Design a protein with these regions (language model features):
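N-terminal capping/small domains of soluble enzymes
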Residues: 2-104, 111
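Catalytic cores of alpha/beta
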Residues: 39, 119-123
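Short loop/turn motifs at secondary-structure junctions
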Residues: 47, 128-130
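Non-cysteine beta-strand/loop elements that form the S-adenosyl-L-methionine
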Residues: 52-59, 130-138
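A short acidic, helix-capping loop that chelates divalent metal ions and anchors anionic groups
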Residues: 140-145
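Alpha-helix N-cap and loop-to-helix initiation/capping positions
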Residues: 146-154
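Conserved small/polar residues in nucleotide/adenosyl-binding loops
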Residues: 156-162
Length: 166
């Protein structure tokens, strides 16, 4: 058998991640793709296994002051600072946009405190999304982000109540 004998539709690329069936294992990295609308004219979102959104917080964040992005030899550096519209606008605008596509929705949840993360998780509980990703690794915010990821006590205070909510 050679590659011309294989019909693309005959290949099952589906995967199960945390109990959620995806049609394929391809998603975008959180923070690089907005909430999908920004790239929908260039990328067929229907072909992705999931869209992982940019971080979403309890309230809107302006992010870090400019400049936020710098080109360096072989790549780019960024310190956007989790700019986002806040959970209410995200639920009103971005989730309905993403629901138009045949792809899973993974919402990246961020915050400055455990309470903010929990507020976002509670707000998302009744929304038609497939998964949540808890962002405890963003290095360019003063509170939250990597501060949670590098402190096991903070991490436990954040993740345990969040897991119990879901």
């Amino acid at each position: 058998m050679n590659s011309s004998d294989i019909n693309k539709t005959d290949i099952n690329m589906s995967v199960k991640i945390a109990g959620v069936e995806w049609k394929n294992p391809v998603t975008v990295a959180s923070g690089t793709f907005g909430s999908g609308a920004e790239y929908s004219e260039f990328v067929d979102l229907n072909k992705l296994g999931a869209v992982t959104t940019k971080g979403v917080a309890d309230k809107p964040w302006e992010g870090n002051p400019t400049p936020r992005v710098a080109e360096v030899y072989g790549g780019m550096l960024n310190a956007v600072g989790l700019q986002n519209p806040g959970i209410e606008l995200f639920c009103k605008r971005d989730i309905p946009f993403l629901k138009k596509y045949d792809t899973k929705i993974v919402v990246n949840v961020c915050g400055h405190s455990a309470e903010e993360y929990i507020n976002v998780v509670k707000r998302l509980a009744d929304e038609p999304i497939d998964m949540m990703e808890i962002n405890i690794s963003c290095p360019n915010v003063k509170e939250g982000g990597i501060a949670f990821g590098t402190d096991p006590v903070s991490y436990t205070h954040l993740t345990l109540p969040t897991i119990l909510l879901v």
